[in-house]
């Protein structure tokens, strides 16, 4: 698995991105229907945290098998990997964060999810006519995308991955410094009432997995679509 992945521009349809899903795939399906998502030509990019908290977490494997769906590895995917592969995981914390469904699975089924999660990159770069758009789960430890790319490809330092998957610093500090080398960087992880843009960093987790709504962003235009689900 490459921790960094570059994807060519979509020449047939639209590329859309969405915030944290957390097992609410049916709500997301409604949102996509409202923006006329066409899986035969369109693609959907996720900032990670596909699972935990919501009732349809097991559907993550079905979505990841679709050729039009692409995701980075979030901290909840990383927790599942750590649990099965001998890492240190506070099980009480993991259950409180919605991981009980995974812990209850037979080990063979856990392995199927972990294999899929291990195949997810930490960082995605999607080409658009107006310039590249990056995706991470939480934040970039560098204000230069090239530095992050090279670090993930050649160094693979745990502290770099930790920032990419767990950091809330940018939002907490109101850091407006852009990440150079990108037109926009799309992240989730920290819930916000409405999409927040700091510099060129878009925070997309608007709580579609709880009482909020999914925010869907078109990559080519950076146009925000925020349909509210009915369930």
Per-region residue spans from a language model:
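Divalent-metal (often Zn2+) His-rich catalytic cores of metallo-beta-lactamase-fold enzymes
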Residues: 132-153
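Core catalytic region of metal-dependent phosphoesterases/phosphodiesterases
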Residues: 14, 18, 23-93
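Divalent metal-coordination and catalytic microenvironments
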Residues: 20, 49, 64, 74-75, ...
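Conserved beta-sheet core of the metallophosphoesterase superfamily
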Residues: 167-228
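Beta-strand-turn-beta hairpins that frame and shape the catalytic cleft
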Residues: 9-16, 125-134
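Active-site neighborhood of divalent metal-dependent phosphoester bond hydrolases
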Residues: 57-126, 130-132, 155-168
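Active-site-proximal beta-strand elements of phosphoester/diester hydrolases
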Residues: 15-22, 133-139, 202-204
């Amino acid at each position: 698995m490459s921790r960094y992945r570059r994807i060519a521009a979509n020449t047939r349809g639209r590329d859309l991105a969405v915030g944290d899903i957390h097992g609410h795939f049916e709500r997301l399906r409604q949102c996509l229907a409202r923006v006329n998502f066409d899986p035969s030509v369109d693609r959907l990019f996720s900032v990670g945290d596909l699972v935990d908290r919501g009732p349809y977490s097991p559907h993550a494997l079905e979505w990841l098998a679709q050729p039009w769906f692409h995701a980075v590895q979030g901290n909840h995917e990383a927790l599942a990997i750590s649990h099965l592969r001998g890492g240190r995981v506070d099980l009480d914390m993991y259950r409180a964060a919605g991981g009980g469904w995974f812990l209850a699975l037979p080990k063979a089924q856990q392995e199927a999810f972990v294999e899929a999660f291990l195949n997810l990159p930490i960082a995605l770069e999607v080409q658009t006519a107006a310039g590249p758009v990056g995706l991470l789960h939480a934040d970039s430890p560098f204000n230069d995308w090239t530095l992050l790319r090279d670090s993930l490809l050649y160094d693979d330092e745990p502290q770099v991955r930790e920032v990419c998957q767990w950091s809330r610093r940018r939002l907490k500090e109101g850091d407006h410094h852009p990440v150079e080398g990108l037109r926009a960087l799309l992240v989730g992880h920290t819930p916000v009432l409405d999409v927040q843009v700091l510099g060129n960093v878009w925070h997309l987790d608007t709580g579609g997995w709880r009482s909020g709504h999914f925010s869907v962003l078109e990559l080519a235009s950076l146009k925000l679509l925020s349909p509210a689900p009915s369930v």
